[in-house]
């Protein structure tokens, strides 16, 4: 059976840039565009030329894309102006792009209140603008803003807006759930009705927002109902609650039975294996920790903790996994916790590359130690590096790179020379490396920061291994109430190549807990990078 072609349209660089706290540079946009092109999307919307200096510069030279078309976004001409005499439209038409996507109203309420013009005038704005864009680029698209709200209020007018764009030469008329409030059953019904009116959905697209956590579901239902273009963003970036997440949509369209059998999104199985890396590239660029629980690509998406689950997964992964993790470039993780059985432990050791004898009595000691530590507050299911350090130490496979003799942290609150009240933290660390005693003193913006700097200030001959080590996240959880509470500290570290790992420490003293986690982080990196202790 021939499959229907569905085209992926990425708007990370335009709609995704509306995310609170996100501000792409021109170089950021170029990097993301290359990643999207490698992934295999059909269209990359680069931004709004003329709206800001960044987008104007980005569109001054078309990026060298091998697979995707480069799209300029903008709005239809303003009321009272011709298409040839509208500065905003002119900036879009001057852009170095392969196509243009113009947004316009399709809800009569918006036409009356926001534009203050007649419905006929709005239809004219759409048609004239699309004609101009089609003449300039050869491919024009119309984003029907508020289409679903407009259709529910006045289906005839919303349909007229879509038809006006298509009749004017638009390759695509994209149905936008701009406010994000439409439900999946409504999307399926409305798209189905529109497809029936037009006779085909081959020139229709869908653009959804995630205000009810239904953006992906709404997009899938629209495809089932007949649209052939799907818009979204990497990791669901977008204004308010975000847009449809292409990272979740792509594998669903490729791997889930109905979509796999009926549509072709122009991506290969090999392309799909780049999905996890693409998602994490964006997070790294934004300096954000990846969402561990993200569908398909999260670190926990294929993580198994319960002993019964692990035993079954090792026999056949289909028992607890809906798709193979490697199909999306992810990996399976077997977690260690107080629920862990021996099977979990052995699998986790194998994954970490730790050699063991199944008859080694120290394996039982390790399992009991893990359970005891978790009872005290440790959590190894999210701190794989700390688990590996503990396991290797118990099994006699952890080198002793250095010894900490003592550390001290002081916090002083005083007035500085300018009469300002400041709080200063200072840490001192005394350690032995190859029999030599080293002292390090460092200040920080807090006691943990100062201790981190002091630990990494001078490790003798190991210093080169940790020069690119940095602490990127620090989480504290109070495990029981009161001033004598036990504290758990979880630290996320990273290196210059973007690799990240997690370590954990527990103590009634928050500084001591942080010290344990910091020590595990440093020792794990030395181990991973092949540092060798003196004989």
Predicted regions and their residues:
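Non-catalytic terminal/interface segments that mediate subunit docking, oligomerization
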Residues: 18, 23, 31, 166, ...
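A glycine-rich helix N-cap at a beta->alpha junction
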Residues: 69-74
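Hydrophobic alpha-helical scaffolding
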Residues: 22, 48-49, 78, 119, ...
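Mixed-charge, glycine-accented linear interaction segment located at domain edges/termini
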Residues: 499-534
């Amino acid at each position: 059976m021939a499959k229907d072609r569905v085209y992926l349209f990425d708007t990370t660089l335009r709609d995704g840039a509306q995310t609170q706290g996100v501000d792409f540079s021109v170089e950021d946009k170029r990097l993301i565009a290359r990643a999207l092109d490698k992934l295999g999307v059909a269209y990359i919307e680069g931004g709004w030329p003329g709206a800001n200096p960044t987008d104007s510069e980005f569109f001054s030279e078309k990026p060298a894309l091998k697979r995707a078309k480069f799209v300029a976004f903008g709005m239809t001409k303003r009321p009272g102006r011709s298409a040839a005499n509208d500065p905003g439209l002119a900036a879009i038409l001057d852009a170095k792009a392969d196509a243009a996507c113009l947004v316009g109203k399709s809800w009569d309420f918006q036409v009356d209140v926001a534009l203050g013009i007649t419905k006929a005038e709005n239809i004219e704005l759409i048609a004239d603008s699309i004609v101009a864009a089609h003449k300039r680029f050869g491919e024009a698209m119309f984003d029907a803003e508020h289409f679903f709200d407009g259709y529910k209020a006045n289906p005839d007018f919303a349909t007229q807006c879509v038809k006006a764009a298509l009749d004017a030469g638009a390759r695509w008329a994209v149905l936008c759930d701009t406010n994000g409030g439409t439900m999946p059953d409504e999307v399926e019904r409305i798209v189905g009705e529109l497809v029936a009116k037009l006779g085909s959905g081959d020139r229709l697209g869908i653009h959804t927002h995630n205000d009810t956590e239904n953006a992906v579901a709404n997009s899938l239902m629209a495809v089932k109902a007949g649209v052939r273009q799907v818009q979204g963003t990497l990791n669901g970036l977008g204004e308010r609650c975000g847009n449809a997440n292409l990272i979740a949509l792509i594998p669903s369209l490729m791997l889930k039975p109905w979509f796999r059998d009926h549509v072709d999104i122009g991506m290969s199985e090999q392309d799909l294996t780049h999905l996890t890396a693409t998602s994490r590239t964006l997070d790294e660029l934004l300096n954000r920790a990846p969402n561990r629980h993200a569908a398909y690509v999260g670190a926990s998406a294929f993580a198994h903790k319960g002993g019964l689950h692990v035993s079954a997964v090792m026999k056949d992964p289909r028992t607890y996994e809906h798709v193979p993790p490697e199909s999306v470039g992810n990996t399976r993780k077997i977690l260690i916790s107080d629920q862990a059985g021996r099977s979990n432990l052995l699998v986790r050791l194998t994954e970490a590359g730790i050699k063991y004898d199944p008859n080694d009595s120290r394996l039982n000691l390790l399992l009991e130690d893990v359970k005891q530590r978790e009872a005290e507050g440790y959590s190894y299911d999210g701190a794989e590096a700390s688990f590996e350090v503990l396991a290797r130490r118990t099994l006699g496979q952890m080198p002793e790179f250095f010894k900490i003799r003592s550390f001290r942290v002081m916090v002083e609150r005083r007035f500085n020379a300018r009469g300002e009240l400041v709080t200063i933290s200072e840490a001192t660390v005394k350690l032995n490396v190859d029999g030599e005693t080293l002292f390090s003193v460092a200040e920080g913006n807090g006691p943990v920061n100062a201790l981190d700097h002091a630990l990494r200030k001078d490790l003798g001959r190991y210093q080169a291994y940790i020069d690119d080590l940095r602490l990127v996240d620090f989480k504290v959880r109070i495990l029981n109430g009161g001033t004598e509470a036990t504290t758990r500290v979880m630290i996320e570290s990273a290196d210059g190549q973007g690799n990240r790992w997690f370590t954990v420490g527990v103590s009634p003293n928050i500084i001591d807990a942080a010290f344990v986690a910091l020590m595990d982080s440093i020792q794990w990196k030395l181990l991973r990078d092949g540092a060798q202790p003196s004989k």
